[in-house]
Amino acid sequence: MRLLCFIALLIGISGYSQETIRIQEVTNNIVMGPFAGNRDLAFGVQNILEEIIQDRDYYLAEDAPKSIKVELLYFDVKKNSMQLAAYGRKADITQIVAGARLIVDGEIVKEVVAKGTAKSISTATLIIDDGGKFSQAGVSTALKKVCEQLINKLKL
């Protein structure tokens, strides 16, 4: 009877266990701009990926058979502005493109590419702008969007 209860307990525990996954190194393959080769950007993307994966009830483990490898491919801020007398309107669109591979037992199972954008629009009656600066909030929003799209496309 004890053996039967023990086996039933083990089956119940294994039925509720989380699936494990590992995030391999995030590589920054951006060639132009201020984020070209920036390791801080790659580290930030890895942290965002870990947060999203844990929110989806996966357990992060270094010895997991399933892993994700992410490459940052493109980063740009497109600026669009209009000025009429003293009135001005400025729109900044931050774009980030990244690719991801789902690897199971050393074999690439799926490859996806995703694009994340964040838009910042400001209007003013007098514009004093140094120009050429990136909005940290725009970059963070675009990174979060691209990471969520990668995970959704990999169907995790």
Annotated model-derived regions:
Residues I7-Y59, K78, V113-K115, L126, ...:
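A structural "domain/chain start" motif
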Residues A36-N47, K90-I93, D129, K133-K145:
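Soluble non-cytosolic domains of exported or imported proteins
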Residues D57-E62, V104-K110, F134-V139, Q149-I151:
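Low-complexity, flexible helical/coil segments
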Residues A64-K115, K119-K133:
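Surface-exposed short loop/turn segments
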